[in-house]
Amino acid sequence: IRRELHVTPAFLCAAILWPVLQQQQQHAEHEGLPAYQALQKAAQKVISEQIKRIGIPKRFTLPMQEIWELQWQLSRRQGGRADRMLEHARFRAAYDFLLLREQAGENLHNLGQWWTDYQAADPEQRLHMQQNLGREDGGARNNNRRRRGGRHRGGPKPDQAKTDQA
């Protein structure tokens, strides 16, 4: 705003409600939800509560929620995720929001600078940046993903096949 750049109402609402969203997300995570589901639940709750107080049109609430959800996705840069993120329609808003969060004092481990450098890099440099992600984080990966058991795509289960043949 100070630099007289265009700022959408959705971006402003996302910024104003960010602390409330973070509180709701922490509460949902304490209830046992994985981080991304907690974020989604918190976003829905914050938006529904705000709609009761002030009229926020859907054309603003949907981009708000997308900006919030992309904050989580911006931290997941492995594989082809970073390149796909650059193609996202709301990448620029999410990136600007990320920089704003860093300027406000959130410790995001230089994530904003990484994305700034990534955008300016050529394809070879981008590949190198992605390959170095694990090394920069001390080799630790975020393995909060849920693991699913093997999927059976059609056909009887092995136990059923034996009983059907008998």
Language-model features: where?
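Catalytic cores of the polymerase beta-like nucleotidyltransferase superfamily
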Residues: I1-A166
